[in-house]
């Protein structure tokens, strides 16, 4: 994509017909217990050394037993913890999966993202979404039913305030006249619509720099990617936009074990994992980040096996 021709983090992660790998925080097999959040700096540094290209964090406020996520994202605030981890690394990119624009004022998001991009140039990836956790919406006094409309308005505000000097913004979210956001990002921050964000596919084919969608089987994912890319071509002829997805992984000690489905992913040995990742690559997935939450083995042990045996097949670009 021409607008990212000289963007360091983007070009390590994304290229047409290529697949790179990332990791989901926490790098821990906590399953349905609260994670300890131990050794995350050490594990992220190890992931960087092995050639993983991205680290992804979630935007969650409250523990909600009805939602089934004891980690509440990664327990710590997404932006603060991202800053902490990024300060301990050198080149791996950090992404939000995803910043809930319906719950965060876009001016605050712009200030945070621009600051992060100045502190860690060309290493920030901005996933944005409308959100889905009712407890967070209720606690903030925000309507869950109108989150799609709020998302669109916040997205438009964010684009204006981040990339225009002294913009004129008239919005229900606020007005900007004769004022300017400082700092500005060092370059455009790659911005990915996450899920459908309560929009139709035409909207996020037109807007954003790529699409991040939930993990699904290759057959189902291929259909969605194909439909989306046809629409992208209609709105932006000859422009490449990357497709991103997470995948839960329970890596077997037996390298020859065949895949069996688990929640949001697969249990498999490494040989079949390489085959599976190549299938995802063939259908147009450009970056896949692995969540080790549901694994049976210690996460550091799994990370070593992935780094030594799987990453060489899907290196940084």
Positions of predicted regions on the chain:
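Conserved, mostly hydrophobic/aromatic
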Residues: 47, 51, 59, 85, ...
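An alpha-helical appendage that flanks or caps ligand/catalytic pockets
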Residues: 1-17, 145-181, 214-317
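Short, acidic/polar
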Residues: 35-47, 112, 193-203, 268-280
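A structural motif
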Residues: 52, 121, 208-209, 285
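Hydrophobic faces of well-ordered beta-strands that scaffold small-molecule active sites
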Residues: 21-25, 55-57, 94-96, 124-128, ...
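Active-site mouth loops of central-metabolism enzymes
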Residues: 25-38, 99-107, 187-196, 258-271
């Amino acid at each position: 994509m021409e607008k990212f021709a000289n963007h360091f983090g983007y070009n390590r992660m994304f290229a047409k017909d290529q697949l790179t790998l990332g990791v989901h925080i926490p790098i821990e097999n906590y399953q349905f217990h609260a994670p300890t959040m131990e050794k995350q700096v050490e594990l992220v540094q190890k992931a960087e050394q092995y050639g993983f290209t991205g680290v992804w964090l979630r935007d969650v406020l409250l523990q909600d037993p009805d939602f089934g996520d004891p980690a509440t994202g990664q327990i710590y605030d997404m932006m603060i913890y991202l800053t902490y981890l990024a300060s301990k690394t050198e080149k791996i990119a950090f992404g939000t999966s995803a910043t809930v624009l319906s719950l965060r004022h876009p001016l605050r998001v712009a200030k945070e993202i621009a600051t992060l991009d100045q502190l860690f140039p060309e290493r920030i990836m901005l996933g944005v979404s409308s959100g889905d956790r009712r407890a967070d919406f209720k606690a903030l006094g925000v309507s869950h039913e109108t989150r799609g409309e709020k998302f669109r308005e916040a997205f438009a505000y964010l684009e204006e305030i981040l990339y225009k000097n002294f913009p004129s913004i008239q919005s229900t979210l606020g007005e900007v006249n004769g004022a300017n956001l400082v700092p500005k990002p060092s370059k455009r921050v790659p911005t990915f619509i996450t899920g459908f964000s309560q929009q139709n596919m035409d909207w996020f084919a037109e807007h954003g720099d790529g699409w991040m969608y939930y993990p699904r089987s290759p057959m189902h994912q291929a259909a969605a990617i194909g439909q989306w890319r046809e629409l992208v071509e209609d709105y932006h002829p000859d422009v490449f936009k990357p497709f991103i997805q997470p995948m839960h992984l329970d890596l077997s000690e037996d390298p020859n074990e065949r895949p069996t489905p688990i929640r949001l992913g697969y249990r498999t040995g490494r040989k079949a994992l390489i085959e599976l990742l190549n299938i995802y690559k063939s259908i147009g997935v450009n970056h896949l980040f692995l969540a080790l939450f549901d694994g049976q083995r210690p996460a550091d042990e799994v990370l070593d096996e992935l780094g030594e045996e799987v990453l060489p097949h899907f290196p940084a670009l």
